[in-house]
């Protein structure tokens, strides 16, 4: 079958930016029956890219891009997408690049749909969010399910509630799979630093755990949810309490990892105080009806919903005008490349 006719069988053309852990998992999903309507026309990591159909079809594409392929050129990738005969054209951003996120609005304005796991725009400065909303007026769509809860149905549920005239009043929960794992497992029987090293070795934290411990990733997720609920919150309006002591914030990663024991005494003290009151420690995000937002470590009673989480579970408790007696709770695994990639695929398929 001629290449042109073969391509016409596909409903959705995709360019994938980022072939790391999440992007690699997304590539694997493209080889499943669920992705039969998708046509990958370009893929790139931070340095190299591939747009040749035969190369893109190879199952070891991610590994090949580590050493082969043309130099990264987004103009070439977009040209490949524009040249496709597919009715729906999608850019998938599986990176954490702030620079790439800043281009989402530009791509939307050009008529491309964008599906992303990148929180830098939706959870960044407020002007960027407003630029994004303005770009959506052109008719292109923005799939961001993977930015919160590794694809748990948080944003989709919130949007449906708003479409039905409901409104978010308060929000509380555990929004980080890594911090959930750490405090679900921290019982004072061994140092926090030992648990942190274990979590890092298992891939539950970033290579530099300060990315998790700072609370900034949780703050981005809180902003994304709040903004989708109608709260025009700026980054500086979220109170973020970092778990990283001031002396450890500016040093390089190697030195930080060598000094993890400096986290032990402060957290052991907080744990002992909480235990004496019958409470446990959890790293919570909270938003109230007045738009006051806070992210940080708090004590909660043993019967609190967040005290009964397991592993890397995330939990989102939404109180709305209609769910006001008891909150609507969404809970499940909040970390992992496979579930995040599945959320990306789900958003792409919803565009077809």
PLM segments and residue spans:
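General beta-strand structural signal in soluble alpha/beta enzymes
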Residues: 90-93, 114-117, 142-145, 170-173, ...
